[in-house]
């Protein structure tokens, strides 16, 4: 009898869930909603998406449904934008209406809240504007675009070259050393100090950063975001975000140490001290985003994004130099002609080095390290490429489809520096070069990244010739996706010139 009594309840629950599912699907029935694969009840298209290789999956769906297609991830409506026209229309033409970020329920476990969202994942509004303005102005005050910061980078490049010299021409993987060098530039900006390359906490921070990136692209994470009800299962979210929580704990320790040396009476030496000074001004203002919780989020954003993206691009650069020794020799010849082999490279040299500049840009295009950018969300109903996209829709901007658009690039799937040179050998930058995204949410660290890429790359090519180790097979030029696209593991030999 008890079992019989449960049957009506089960049927009622099933009907309720079906109605909820139908409510979330109703926009797909609109006349001009983008096409897409048929979603399953409850799960939507979660099983249609390969989260281990999302860029490839989206490319296959683009070929089937066109440059603007839709998905339903559980009950979350998603539209994927492909190609330069669709991406630019969304991010630039409709920039005000697509500048928001979708809520990420699982991030509440990390301390995200209305006034503690950092910069990159913050919702579009007063708190984001406040932190974006603060970050840009503080980086400028600390020397971005000036000789002072350029000197920090060139000194760190000298330390990196010394570490490469210590390898004595033996085969080694360069990734860890590149991580350390780039991280020290970020550490100088955020903590006012650099770390020795063998510092145990420094090494631990790298490990946690890379593990956290793997967590970002996990299937279970996407399920928890799509079905927030599952977050109520005790301990599940903490397990999924174990490395990200440990990363934030490590940053907290560094911030606590740094506060002990802060003198409010002195001008800020770094971003952390500038933030602490703003916190003092904002005391008693509950609406301010300058608070303890947001300090760790802002520093975490700058440290993780600023370190991993640039060091990964440099890793791609060295890989492509050993795969294309003719390009490497031509870069070195330009370095010798413009800079020589004695003095350190300077940003002022870049204007006289069109080929090296073209190579660096082609490394960014070919490496395509952030293929899907960061998700956006519509803040009102918009029309895009002839389709109607409702308010609250999550947008994926497929930057990979722009950087490797067959209609724009002569050889989209090959490493070809001439993409960025005109017939006279002058540097040119096509409109489809969007590795930093575009619009209101374009990467705020772009000027710093450009400086680091030029100075680190030219310093390394000035001092060393790179080659595939004798007896080893030619490394793969295919990347590995885990939110970022990193080169497949490889070794090289760095021989002093």
Curated annotation (Swiss-Prot):
A UniProt-annotated Pfam family: p450
The compartments listed are: Endoplasmic reticulum membrane; Microsome membrane
Alphabetized GO MF terms: heme binding; iron ion binding; oxidoreductase activity, acting on paired donors, with incorporation or reduction of molecular oxygen, reduced flavin or flavoprotein as one donor, and incorporation of one atom of oxygen
Q: Which cofactors, if any, are listed as required?
A: heme
Asked if Heme is a keyword of the record, the answer is: yes
According to the UniProt record, one GO cellular component term is: endoplasmic reticulum membrane
Keywords in alphabetical order: Endoplasmic reticulum, Heme, Iron, Membrane, Metal-binding, Microsome, Monooxygenase, Oxidoreductase
State the reactions this protein catalyses. Answer: an organic molecule + reduced [NADPH--hemoprotein reductase] + O2 = an alcohol + oxidized [NADPH--hemoprotein reductase] + H2O + H(+)
For heme, which residues are the binding ones? 443
Q: How does it sit in the membrane?
A: Peripheral membrane protein
Q: Which EC number(s) are documented for this chain?
A: 1.14.14.1
A single GO BP annotation from the record?
Answer: xenobiotic metabolic process
What's the protein here called?
Cytochrome P450 2D17
Q: Which gene encodes it?
A: CYP2D17
């Amino acid at each position: 009898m008890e079992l019989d009594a449960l049957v009506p309840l089960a049927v009622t629950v099933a009907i309720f869930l079906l109605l909820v599912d139908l409510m979330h699907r109703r926009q797909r029935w609109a006349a001009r909603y983008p096409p897409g694969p048929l979603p399953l009840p409850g799960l939507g298209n979660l099983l249609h998406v390969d989260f281990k290789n999302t860029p490839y999956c989206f490319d296959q769906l683009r070929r089937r449904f066109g440059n603007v297609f839709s998905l339903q991830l559980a009950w979350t409506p998603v539209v994927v934008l492909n190609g330069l026209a669709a991406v630019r229309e969304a991010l630039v033409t409709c920039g005000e209406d697509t500048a928001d970020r979708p809520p990420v329920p699982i991030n509440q476990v990390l301390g995200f809240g209305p006034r503690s969202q950092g910069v990159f994942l913050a919702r579009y509004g007063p708190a984001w504007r406040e932190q974006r303005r603060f970050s840009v102005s503080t980086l400028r005050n600390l020397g971005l675009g000036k000789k002072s910061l350029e000197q920090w980078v060139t000194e760190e490049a000298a330390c990196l070259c010394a570490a490469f010299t210590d390898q004595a021409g033996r085969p080694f993987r360069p990734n860890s050393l590149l991580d350390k060098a780039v991280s020290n530039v970020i550490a100088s900006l955020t903590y006012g100090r650099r770390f020795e390359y063998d510092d145990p906490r420094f090494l631990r921070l790298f490990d946690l950063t890379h593990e956290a990136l793997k967590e970002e692209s996990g299937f279970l994470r996407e399920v928890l975001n799509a079905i927030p009800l599952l977050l109520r299962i005790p301990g599940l979210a903490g397990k999924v975000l174990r490395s990200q929580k440990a990363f934030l704990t490590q940053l907290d320790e560094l911030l606590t140490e740094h506060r002990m040396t802060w003198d409010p009476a002195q001008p800020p030496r770094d971003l952390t001290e500038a933030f602490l000074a703003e916190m003092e001004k904002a005391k008693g203002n509950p609406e301010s985003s300058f608070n303890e919780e947001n300090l760790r989020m802002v520093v975490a954003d700058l440290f993780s994004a600023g370190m991993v993206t640039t060091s990964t691009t440099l890793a791609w650069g060295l890989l492509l130099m050993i795969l294309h020794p003719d390009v490497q020799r031509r870069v070195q010849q330009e370095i010798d002609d413009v800079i020589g082999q004695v003095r350190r490279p300077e940003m002022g040299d870049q204007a006289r080095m069109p080929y090296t500049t073209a190579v660096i840009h082609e490394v960014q295009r070919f490496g395509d390290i952030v293929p899907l950018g960061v998700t956006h969300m519509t803040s009102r109903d918009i029309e895009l490429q002839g389709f109607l996209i409702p308010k609250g829709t999550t947008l994926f901007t497929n930057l990979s489809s722009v950087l490797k658009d067959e209609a724009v690039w002569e050889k989209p799937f090959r490493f070809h520096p001439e993409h960025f040179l005109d017939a006279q050998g002058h540097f040119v930058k096509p409109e489809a070069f969007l590795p930093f995204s575009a619009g209101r949410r374009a990467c705020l660290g772009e000027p710093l990244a450009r400086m680091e890429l030029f100075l680190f790359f030219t310093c390394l090519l000035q001092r060393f010739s790179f080659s595939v180790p004798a007896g080893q097979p030619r490394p793969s030029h295919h990347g590995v996706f885990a939110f970022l696209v990193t080169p497949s593991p490889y070794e090289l030999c760095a021989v002093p010139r």
